[in-house]
Curated annotation (Swiss-Prot):
Provenance organism: Homo sapiens (Human)
Subcellular location: Membrane
Membrane-spanning segments: 238-258
Record GO cellular component, one term: membrane
Main location: membrane
Keyword Membrane attributed: yes
Membrane topology, from the record: Single-pass membrane protein
Pfam families: TMCO5, TMEM191C
Residue segments, region Disordered: 1-21, 54-73
Coiled-coil features, chain-numbered ranges: 5-160
Gene: TMEM191C
Keyword list, A-Z: Coiled coil, Membrane, Transmembrane, Transmembrane helix
Family classification: Belongs to the TMEM191 family.
InterPro entries reported for this sequence: SMCO2/5, TMEM191B/C
Name this polypeptide is given: Transmembrane protein 191C
């Protein structure tokens, strides 16, 4: 754009110089026209004088006698010399007139050339101005697109930051739930141990009871153990924790994958490849170890 403006300024300067040169040539042409008119008038005067001298010569050519003839001869000689001088002056004026005509033709051709060059400069200047306007419009459009893309990226970054904050909050909640689940599992283990001890004492006291009554008592204990309000609440808590454990990693994985695809699509394959590394598998075992402990404690189905 700077080169275009510089070229436009140079063309404007050349245009001003051409106009100034044109004015100078027009002024010189007016002077030459005035001088040519003056020379033509002088040439006409000399021609008139020549005709007058010729008439006087013809009149003086009549037969004279004595001194009158001699005087007439002298006057005729002077007239002849003057005619020769007038003829030479006429030739000089004609030559000068031809030179002026040649100069006039040269000036006319220069004026035509500069006039055409000025028209060409004006056309080029108009084209450059149109190109400059087009470039300015394209620049404004590109700046608008860049601003929109920047605003979109800022919104995406803000959404990602909000999702990350929500994920961290849910992670803290998940850790608290996991601690509570472990505590509940320990309480359930202790409660089951106490019930088993009580059941053993009861079986020692009622050893002589009929087998049918023993089966009914065992079924009743199992119903109270696994169908009571406390066991149902613990089971619901465990299931809710499992749902949170399964939902949060998937949510974080989806957000990370979406952000990575937006920034660098080529990094997705490298990221998927890193999921199968030994470090990732070790972290997965460490994350799933509490679930294995819950299954060992009888809180998860086998």
């Amino acid at each position: 754009m700077a080169a275009t403006q510089e070229l436009l300024l140079q063309l404007q300067k050349d245009n001003r110089d051409g106009r100034q040169r044109k004015q100078e040539l027009e002024k010189l042409m007016r002077g030459l026209e005035a001088e040519s008119e003056s020379l033509n008038q002088r040439l006409q005067d000399l021609s008139e004088r020549e005709r007058s001298l010729l008439r006087r010569r013809s009149q003086a050519a009549q037969p004279l006698q004595g001194e009158a003839r001699e005087a007439a001869r002298e006057r005729a000689e002077r007239v002849r010399r003057r005619l020769e001088e007038a003829e030479r002056h006429k030739e000089y004026l004609e030559q000068h007139s031809r030179q002026l005509q040649e100069q006039w033709e040269e000036l006319s051709s220069q004026l035509f050339y500069y006039g055409g060059e000025l028209q060409s400069q004006k056309s080029t200047e108009q084209q450059l101005a149109a190109q400059l306007v087009t470039l300015q419009n394209e620049l404004e459009l590109a700046e608008t697109k860049c601003a929109l893309q920047e605003e979109k990226l800022q919104q995406d970054a803000l959404q990602t930051a909000e999702a990350w904050a929500i994920f961290q909050e849910q992670t803290v909640v998940l850790q608290e739930v996991q601690v509570k689940v472990m505590e509940a599992a320990e309480e359930l283990d202790a409660w089951q141990s106490g019930r088993e001890l009580c059941d053993g004492q009861l079986r020692g006291v009622q050893y002589s009871t009929e087998s049918l009554m023993e089966e009914m008592a065992r079924a009743d204990r199992e119903t109270r153990l696994f169908g009571g309000p406390r066991a149902l609440a613990i089971r619901r808590c465990v299931l809710g924790a499992l749902q949170v454990l399964l939902t949060l990693p998937l949510l974080f994985l989806g957000l990370s994958l979406l952000w990575t695809v937006l920034l660098d699509p080529g990094a997705v394959s490298a990221w998927l490849w890193s999921l199968t590394s030994e470090t990732t598998l070790r972290r997965l075992r460490y994350t799933l170890s509490p679930l294995l402990e819950l299954r060992a404690n009888g809180l998860l189905p086998t």
